[in-house]
Design a protein with these regions (language model features):
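Macromolecular interaction modules
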Residues: 1-120
Length: 120
């Protein structure tokens, strides 16, 4: 059963493509990174051709993840943004390539990006 603070969203058809970005952020830069992401990066990404929507999520505390049978516990919060795209080519536009700012956080922000394409 869902916690009272959660909202059940209606089921929708999978868009043609999803871009899923998962990020670990060191606590020392977390507030600055969140300001930049919310005020600059996310609006810039949503303005790119072929990007339909984006939604951010954050873990409530430590998380455990497994990859190919290996399990690890993260002591940092885990951020995930899911973007709905018209096609995988949306990440290849000049507007998407022109987005800047991620590098200023250097090794304090570690990310993994996946593109998921709907079949059928």
């Amino acid at each position: 059963m869902s916690a009272p603070s959660e909202t059940l969203l209606p089921v929708r058809l999978l868009p043609p493509c999803l871009l899923i970005v998962t990020v670990e952020v060191d606590i020392e830069v977390e507030a600055d990174w969140n300001r930049w992401y919310d005020d600059v990066h996310l609006p810039d990404a949503l303005a790119c051709p072929g990007v339909r929507a984006g939604r951010r999520y954050v873990s409530s505390g430590e998380v455990s993840e497994s990859d190919r049978g290996e399990q690890r516990r993260l002591r940092t919060r885990l951020y995930t943004t899911v973007y709905e795209l018209d096609a995988p080519s949306a990440v290849e536009t000049k507007e998407f390539a022109a987005m800047r700012g991620w590098g200023r956080f250097g090794p304090r922000v570690r990310s993994q990006t996946r593109v998921v394409v709907a079949v059928g």
